Amino acid sequence: MEYTTPPCDLNAVRMYRLNRVRAELEKRDLSGIILYDQLNTRYACDATNMQIWCSHNEARYLYVPTEGPVVLFDFGGKDILCEGLPTVDEIRPPINFFYMVAGVEYANRAHEWAADIDGIMGTHNRWNKRIAIDRMSPLGVQELERLGYQILDGFEVMESAREIKSDGEIQLMKKSVEVCEQAIGMMREALVPGITENALWAELHRGNIAGGGEWIETRLLASGPRTNPWFRESSMRPIEKGDMVSFDTDLVGPYGYCCDMSRSWICDAEPNDEQKRLYAEAYHQIQDNKVLLKPGITFREVTDSLRPMADEFVPGRYGVAMHGVGLCDEFPAVYYPQDWDKHGNDGVMKEGMVMCVEALIGSQGGREAVKLEEQVLITADGIEQLTSYPLETEWL
């Protein structure tokens, strides 16, 4: 981010991340990886260019070889957005074959694209025609396979690389948390009867952008009866006195790191007994579950040790009990016992992983729900909590 003083050595973070990617490629005996996903591209080289637009238009891509020069095929074909980056060795104009720009020539453009990739890979000593791709049009995959390439899942590579954060990454994440919590403070000040959900949600956006942040992934703010069931998006509903207001930030802040925390408040009133009851259970879910995290514990062991949830709250439980986070929500996802057989996948918690611990508490058919979430770093001794915006402990 230009015109800022970073809290750490950005080039050290950049090289750490690139080396993590290359280590995962090495483990899988891959020649390299082609990245179209904008957050994977950000992780591997830290070059940004219209990230949201390029997330739904395959207009820029990155080739990271296991050995050899990293090539960024950037929209516009210029280097103004990656000057001085130690992670990018060459800039080229992209060969785009998405329909908006290629029209009826998309098949021919895909053929040209594959020939170009083949030419680049053919210059590398490690050329074995095993390559990973994170996301792209099936036509591009077909063209590479026609040239004899074996295509592997790029998300396995990238999620594995992104799993362990460096000290520098944690410093950048703490900056994102700082900006997010300042913006939450702006929301709290703006919360008065009559303000719409959207106007309140806009305060989070305003604080994030003004503080150097980038975007917000979702629209998860709801009030009163719109909180239960969860996942209704922010609306033009005026918030009323005494309403529960619940929100989930999903905020991509400064330097591209995510602050994913949730809070629930009452608008201009003291909570009633039912609101206190819901809040207390959500609070204890967070407190009891976050301390389970430590290096070496398996995902299944975490699932089996989660705080039991009363039957009335089970139907409205959140989709996961906790999940990883970095530039966005990341691997792993840890599920509730009720969901393990269908969705569970095992693994091991490691030092350096950052996890978000979730709680969503609302009775089936009840008026409101409480959403709480904290972001924590797994350390050698347990956890360091990264989020610190106060909870409503006086309601307990």
Predicted regions and their residues:
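Active-site neighborhoods and metal-handling regions in enzymes and metal-associated proteins
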Residues: 1-396
